[in-house]
Regions:
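Charge-dense, helix-prone N-terminal extensions
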Residues: 1-110
Length: 110
C-alpha cells in the first residue's frame, strides 16, 4: 500500500526546515530523517510510524492511541504505530511529529 501523500505533506509542514532533515521512501512509506535517524514515517491509510525513546514506549502505549510496531511478528523497540483517526488534526499530529523529531535529533548523526 502506498503512503498517504496528504499526510506526508502535513508532516513536512510541521517539521519545517529543521537542520539535517531528509526524506526517504522505505517500506512502502515516506520516512522523515533527522541527522540520518528516522523520526517519523507516513504510511498507507493515514497511519504514521513514530520513533520514540524505547523507555517511553510502554507508557505511551498505555496512555495514548499508539500501538507497538511489529515487523515480521516481532515488536520493534522504540517504534509505535498510530492510526489515522488519532492524527486527523494538526495539533495531534504535531505532538507525534515533535516526539519523533526530538528523539531522532537526540541520537548521534549517521
Amino acid at each position: 500500500m502506498a503512503y498517504d501523500e496528504e499526510l506526508a505533506g502535513r508532516i513536512r509542514t510541521l517539521l519545517g526546515d529543521r537542520a539535517g532533515l531528509t526524506e526517504q521512501k522505505m517500506f512502502g512509506g515516506l520516512a522523515f530523517l533527522i541527522g540520518g535517524n528516522m523520526a517519523i514515517a507516513a504510511s498507507g491509510g493515514g497511519r504514521i510510524l513514530v520513533r520514540v525513546d524505547p523507555a517511553e514506549s510502554d507508557p505511551l502505549v498505555a496512555t495514548t492511541p499508539a500501538e507497538p510496531m511489529e515487523m515480521r511478528g516481532r515488536q520493534m523497540a522504540g517504534w509505535l504505530r498510530v492510526e489515522a483517526g488519532a492524527v486527523s488534526d494538526d495539533a495531534a499530529l504535531g505532538e507525534w511529529v515533535e516526539r519523533g523529531a526530538g528523539y531522532a535529533a537526540s541520537l548521534p548523526p549517521k
